[in-house]
Each structure stands twice: as structure tokens, then as C-alpha cells.
Amino acid sequence: MRTPITCLLAVLPLAANAAKPWQTVNDGETFKVDCEGTYQHHLQGVCTDETSIYWSFTTTLVKTDTTGKVLKKIPVANHHGDLCIHDGKLFVAVNLGKFNDPKGNADSWVYVYDADSLQQLARHETQEVFHGAGGIGVRDGRFFVVGGLPGGVEENYVYEYDDEFKFLKKHVIKSGHTLLGIQTATFAHDRWWFGCYGNPRILLVTDADFEMTGRYEIDCSLGIEGMTGGRLLVGSGRCEKDEGCNGTAMIAFPDPKTGFRFQNAAVQ
């Protein structure tokens, strides 16, 4: 979503894990990936097939290996938000209109890309996402789109689509208000994870039916993705004037007290 973003990156002792493949990182270890390069706009989301990492930088879609080396990148329409991967394809929440407009003057879409080549394959209208599509997750072959929220609204909304993007249902999360709605989404480890802006930034966790199970003051508003082995991949980044914006991804583990945790890191 269009809002100034400044995120602090954790300073990590990486030497012990620098040469270790991230697929084998276990609880108690640290793994961090810096996306190569800088970009005009800030990070919106990350996803992975555990072979490559995909990064949405608002107007640039980037594919890297698991060390952060760029393999492919393409310019994309403003505003590409959060993304997910399914069946060899990337699905990106896109808004071409106004975010967070109480009158619903958004223009919500999901754009589909080939995960190998980043070639665009399809565009699906998701105009039911009334305040602007900003995030997307997938579960059992169905897609769940989240997005903006005007001030004063004390709940969030999730819009469910089938595999051909036929609208199925609008779900309500009794979350209380979150600034500009929900930015990132993933279904992992039998629950939904939703990253939100704010001061402090907020993580919402629900069960599979969108009933709240936790609200945490921890930041995954720039990306969260489920991984095998009970792990999560969490995105972060920052923008520097005259230098551009960068992105980082770190492996985390669910934690019932804090939402999730990074090992050996002071997370801010």
C-alpha cells in the first residue's frame, strides 16, 4: 500500500550458517537472505518454493536464488502488492485505483506470472475487494485476497476465490482496527498469518475459519510465507533517500507468546 515505510533490520551473527543451505536450517539457528540490488519502491511481499525466492517491490517483480542473487526481474504496474506461489505460478494482489477509500474507488486484480520465466500469464478481476487488493494467500487450491481498510472500521475482510477466480465468499476477521487493513497473508501450519502496518506493526493469527487466535506486536507487514519443517519466511526492508529500497528475508518459527521468533536476533 502507498505509505512511507521504514523498517529496522536485525543485526545477526551469520558466520555459523553462512554456507548452510536454508532448507536445512532448524529451530535455534539463524538464516537471513538479502535481495540483491535496490529498487524504486518498497517491498510488499515475499514467497518461496524453497528453491527460489520471489520479491514484490511495488513496481518491480524479482526472482532470486536462496542466497539473494537476482535471477530475473521485470517492471510491473503500480501497485503490485503481496504475492503467493502455487502450482508453478505466482499470484500477485494488484490495485490500480485508490486504497482505503470508504467509497470503494479501488481497482482490484490478481495478476498471474510463470514462476520460472516471470512471464505474465493472466489477469483476474477481484473487484469484490472493496478497499483495494494488497495481499494474497492460497489454501487447498483456493485464493484468499486481503487489502485496504478505512479508518474507524474495527474488523478486517478476506475475499475467497476458486481456482478460476470466481468469487466465493467474504470472510470477516474480528481483529479490531489495523492501519490500512492487511498487507500480507499466508496459510501455514494450520493457521492464517496476516501482517499489518501500524505503530507498532501488528501480526494477526487466525484459525482456518478466520477466528482470531492471537494479535501480536511484531512485524511481518512486508512479507510472510509458510515453509516446511514448521518454519516461516518473514520479509523486511527499508528505503533510503537517493539510494532506493532493499529487501531481506529471514527464517522464523511460530511462538505462542510473540507470534513468531527469529533466533539470535533482536527483532524491532
Predicted regions and their residues:
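A short beta-strand motif characteristic of beta-propeller blades
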Residues: 28-37, 68-74, 119-126, 167-175, ...
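Beta-strand-rich domains and repeat architectures in extracellular enzymes and scaffolds
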Residues: 32-59, 79-81
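Repeated scaffold domains used in trafficking and secretory/extracellular systems
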Residues: 40-45, 78-85, 128-138, 178-184, ...
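Short coil/turn segments that connect the beta-strands within blades of beta-propeller domains
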Residues: 50-51, 87-88, 140-142, 189-190, ...
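Short, solvent-exposed loop/turn segments at conserved positions within beta-propeller repeat blades
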Residues: 55-56, 100-108, 149-155, 197-199, ...
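Short loop/turn segments that connect beta-strands within beta-propeller blades
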Residues: 65-69, 114-118, 162-166, 206-209
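Blade-loop segments of beta-propeller domains
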Residues: 69-100, 108
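Beta-propeller blade signature
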Residues: 105-115, 156-163, 248-261
